[in-house]
Amino acid sequence: MKIRHWSALSLFVLPALAQAEALTGEVHRQPLNIQAIVMFLLFVGGTLYITYWASKRTRSRQDYYTAGGRITGFQNGLAIAGDYMSAASFLGISALVYASGYDGLIYSIGFLIGWPIILFLIAERLRNLGRYTFADVASYRLQQRPIRTLSACGSLVVVALYLIAQMVGAGKLIQLLFGLNYHVAVVLVGILMVLYVLFGGMLATTWVQIIKAVMLLSGATFMAIMVMKSVNFNFNTLFSEAVKVHPKGLSIMSPGGLVSDPISALSLGLALMFGTAGLPHILMRFFTVSDAKEARKSVFYATGFIGYFYILTFIIGFGAILLVGPNQTFKDAAGALLGGNNMAAVHLANAVGGSFFLGFISAVAFATILAVVAGLTLAGASAVSHDLYASVIKKGKANERDELRVSKITVIILGIVAIGLGILFENQNIAFMVGLAFSIAASCNFPIIIISMYWDKLTTRGAMIGGWLGLSTAVILMILGPTIWVTILGHEKPIYPYEYPALFSMIAAFVGTWFFSITDNSETGKQERLLFKSQFVRSQTGLGASKGGAH
């Protein structure tokens, strides 16, 4: 019974722990892989050409932020999948399956938990009410300046933390796969992400994400097919043979006790489940399609692609047990896997496709990072230029040219900051950074979006107090928790005993928003409640919503 209890809880512990598997600990530098370098250069050359092509078609603010709303639902679904599937999760989940078997499947399923929330509760209404950023939705019937300031701050904190995790992950992965120096790798990723976003905007970012998704799905599909071919496409054979060669034997086919602390597990689970629906770079993608119908299609396709991908990682993990585990070519003198368990999928690529396919998978891992950081950079730049500069500082009176200039300056600044933080945080725990980013998205962005769309009694006062309460509670509890208070600051015991704060910070955000809204008897508050009806009609019908260009 206890095992079932822990396995149910571990269902919620999603990408962060899997990423920890992939990218924490000592990195074993690999020899220079010429095929990987060539394929990576081909990818970079191709995507830079796409950026040049996109720059010729990016003339207005709408083009820059949303690709003119001309992306189809299918294309956007692929791009969202490309934005969401990280290299760390690919290597991490494969490594987890390789080491623990069935437990890896729990993590794979966990990645999908947040997507039904976006599909059923958010996608259509977000597209009907917003134009460029989710702050357009949150501030639809509330006071523009305070709500946009809150939304932009929430976005920038999430983007900064997620960028740190991606840049550190980029450096470690490239050092691992290509044999390049960590600092060189971080600078290279920073320069490329700035080029994509600065010149190509959302159009270039979208196509980089689509190409990356196709490459990753194709590579993973080929690996899974080759694994299944080796067992005559029989799952019983795959699992029974894996049990025979794995050191843990039959226990890899049953759930284990991966989670030791139920409160931390539940807290991280809530963060990753609801945080997905508060990630600015994911939400921004819904404005790239023409209408709410295409937005709904986007999530439908994205969920399918992401779910399919994580099924493949499970097969890849078991394939690694079968084809990599017993093969001494992939082991060091001590009998451990070269590069650690996180290299299981990469070694499997070598086992099923030789050095050429190994080079392809290595290049795909790099492409994956570039796609994610490009999306994050654009989301951060739009929060500064559209929400802070145009709406707060200029009070909605900024012209397009000035707003775009501010956005592009922000892209350059974000690139420099990302490189600096990537180098500064080289030895920090990536899982912790990702968990914090999701915790803040779930504690600040998600409550404001969902309540503003569904609750007619929300007022600016309630949204502001609840949002800032959620944001500050998440940050304060994280600082007082074991990772920062003990590991980084060197105190003996943490004041807040759990790893992640979302269980408490989300409650603080929702309760604060509810209480300070229902006790708001001001004239402004009454007017904001009356405006809900017209907002509801537009959110359901799309009447008056901005339309994208023709496909």
Curated annotation (Swiss-Prot):
HAMAP family from the xrefs? Answer: Acet_symport_ActP
Bilayer disposition of the protein: Multi-pass membrane protein
GO MF terms listed in the record are:
acetate transmembrane transporter activity; glycolate transmembrane transporter activity; symporter activity
Recite the UniProt keywords alphabetically: Cell inner membrane, Cell membrane, Ion transport, Membrane, Sodium, Sodium transport, Symport, Transmembrane, Transmembrane helix, Transport
Q: PROSITE patterns per the record?
A: NA_SOLUT_SYMP_1, NA_SOLUT_SYMP_3
- What is the name of the protein in this document? Cation/acetate symporter ActP
Could you tell me the superkingdom of the organism this chain comes from? Answer: Bacteria
Claim: Ion transport is one of the keywords in the record? yes
Outline what the protein does.
Transports acetate.
Q: Mind telling me which CDD domains this protein's record contains?
A: SLC5sbd_u4 (cd11480)
Instruction: Please provide an example of a Pfam family that matches this protein in its UniProt record.
Output: SSF
**What's the family?**
Belongs to the sodium:solute symporter (SSF) (TC 2.A.21) family.
Q: Where in the cell is it found?
A: Cell inner membrane
Q: What is its main location?
A: membrane
For this UniProt entry, which segments traverse the membrane? 5-25, 34-54, 77-97, 104-124, 150-170, 184-204, 207-227, 263-283, 304-324, 356-376, 406-426, 430-450, 469-489, 498-518
**UniProt xrefs under Gene3D superfamilies:** Sodium/glucose cotransporter
Cellular compartments per GO CC? plasma membrane
GO biological process terms held by the UniProt record: plasma membrane acetate transport; sodium ion transport
Key word Transport present: yes
